[in-house]
Amino acid sequence: MSNNISENILSLLNCKVFCLGDLMLDEYVIGTTNRISPEGPIPVLDINKEVKMLGGVGNVVRNLSTLATETYLVSLLGDDSVSKEVEKKLEKINVHKNIIKDSNRPTITKSRFIANDQQILRVDKENTIPISKKIEKKIYECSKKQIL
């Protein structure tokens, strides 16, 4: 491996990359705060913009797709409306995907609330309980197919 970053990035072109990890939706709620809520000592966010993008391993595969790599993804999503949004975003990038659905957990969503260029809150919607043996086996089988 070279010490030259440009050479290292170019070496990724036209190679195959396998990605396994948490696929999620990153949401940014951006606005300004100019007042405090009368209900409690918290700022009131006046929303100017909302942005949703692939997060976790989705961010990795999105970045890899810009390098013309052949990218393979295995991940888990909930069986919910957020998973449909994530899958739509995956359709827009060049990735071979194998998504396993688990109706016992929500699709991970990380919502960041930003006011006046400062993050003031992050809300995580996820199930941190380990996946079932059945789902684990599905992930293993899908991964094996992608690698071989």
Which ranges hold each PLM region?
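Substrate-binding N-lobe of the ribokinase-like
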Residues: S2-L10, C15, P38, I42-T109
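Residue-level marker for buried hydrophobic side chains located in beta-strands
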Residues: V17-C19
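Conserved phosphate-binding/catalytic loop of the ribokinase/pfkB sugar-kinase fold
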Residues: N98-R105, R112-Q146
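Feature captures the catalytic cores and cofactor-binding loops of soluble hydro-lyases/lyases
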Residues: R35
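Active-site metal-binding loops of divalent metal-dependent hydrolases
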Residues: L23
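Short gly/ser/thr-rich secondary-structure transition/capping motifs
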Residues: M1-N3, K137-K138
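Extended acidic/charged loop-beta regions that coordinate divalent cations
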Residues: D26-T32
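Short basic/glycine-enriched coil/helix segment immediately N-terminal to the Walker B
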Residues: L12-L13, Q146-L148
